[in-house]
């Protein structure tokens, strides 16, 4: 519903808010756009997160020899790319803006640490999912570039000391508390440091328990999937 219906119907931008009958409420909190839990518009970080969750769910279905919908991997790539295009460096400075409207125009320019962490995790997960499908290095180069760029950003602007990440920056990448104060969570950063070192499936906790750290390749046979090309010539 979230990815294959709502994101697809809204140009791969995921609506955040719904009525009790699951109708999108696109104007919700327009008058309070920086609400810490229910911001107005589109949150690119959630697009990145849903892209990762989609390939992880797909990995779970493969692992259990269940039917895998054809749309899953391609949709993950589309929602990842829309979030990247809308959010990354769009106001002239490094970093992801917090929110945009449904045309991709930035609304809240603050940079949240969790957004770039989800970008790091999503780029690593999609890259590995493609490799697990038997795709070549040229198909994953884009995700490797994103991964390295976002790791570099985190190191330059977010990591204060080992294990200490600044949670919010302003549009000029200076510490801010407009939305959040302090350091309310660590799990996004922890995931970002581990995702590239683990398989797409099982989950991080189970993979660590099984001793899969630094063994990211799938134990299952490669699956063929249709390449999703970018650039001047569009999709192949």
Predicted region positions:
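Glycan-recognition and catalytic cores of secretory/periplasmic carbohydrate-active enzymes
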Residues: 1-236
């Amino acid at each position: 519903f979230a990815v294959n219906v709502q994101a697809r119907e809204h140009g791969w931008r995921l609506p955040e808010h719904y009525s009790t009958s699951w109708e999108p409420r696109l104007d919700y909190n327009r008058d309070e756009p920086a609400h810490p839990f229910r911001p107005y518009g589109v949150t690119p970080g959630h697009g990145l997160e849903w892209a990762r969750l989609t390939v992880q769910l797909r990995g779970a279905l493969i692992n259990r020899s269940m039917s895998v919908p054809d749309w899953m991997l391609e949709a993950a790539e589309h929602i990842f790319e829309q979030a990247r295009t809308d959010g990354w460096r769009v106001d002239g400075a490094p970093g992801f803006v917090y929110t945009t409207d449904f045309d991709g125009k930035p609304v809240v320019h603050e940079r949240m640490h969790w957004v770039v962490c989800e970008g790091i995790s999503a780029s690593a997960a999609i890259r590995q999912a493609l490799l697990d499908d038997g795709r070549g290095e040229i198909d994953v180069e884009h995700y490797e570039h994103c991964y390295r760029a976002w790791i570099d950003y985190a190191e330059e602007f977010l990591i204060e000391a080992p294990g200490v990440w600044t949670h919010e920056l302003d549009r000029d990448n200076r510490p801010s508390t407009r939305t959040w104060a302090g350091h309310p969570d660590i799990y996004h950063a922890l995931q970002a440091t581990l995702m590239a070192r683990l398989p797409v499936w099982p989950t991080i906790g189970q993979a660590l328990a099984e001793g899969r750290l630094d063994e990211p390749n799938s134990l299952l046979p490669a699956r063929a999937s249709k390449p999703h090309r970018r650039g001047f010539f569009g999709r192949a």
